[in-house]
From Swiss-Prot:
Coiled coil: none annotated. This is UPF0358 protein SH1840. Transmembrane segments: none annotated. It comes from the Bacteria. InterPro entries: UPF0358, UPF0358_sf. It holds the Pfam family DUF1507. Belongs to the UPF0358 family.
């Protein structure tokens, strides 16, 4: 069982690193609100979010990550994305 626990920790840590990378993209955009609705940026962000969701789903299916933990990870990113859109509409 300890091996499974270690694998779960490694899997969750990797998901967190990927989430932090996406969070960094969001924060860079929030700091540089010159082109917040840039279609290219939105496409990259959507692709990254989709990819992370698939990673989370896969880790959950393998039993490496708890479904609720994966959901909370995605929720955290979605909240940051919401802040970006809110900041943009307040600047306009």
């Amino acid at each position: 069982m300890p091996k499974q626990s270690k694998m779960s920790n490694v899997a969750y840590e990797q998901l967190n690193q990927d989430a932090d990378r996406i969070l960094h993209l969001i924060k860079v955009q929030m700091d540089n609100l010159t082109l917040p609705s840039c279609p290219l940026y939105e496409e990259v962000l959507d692709t990254q979010m989709f990819g992370l969701q698939k990673e989370v789903d896969f880790a959950v299916k393998l039993g490496l990550v708890d479904k609720e933990d994966g959901k909370n990870l995605m929720l955290r990113l979605e909240k940051e994305l919401s802040k970006l859109h809110e900041a943009f509409t307040n600047v306009k």
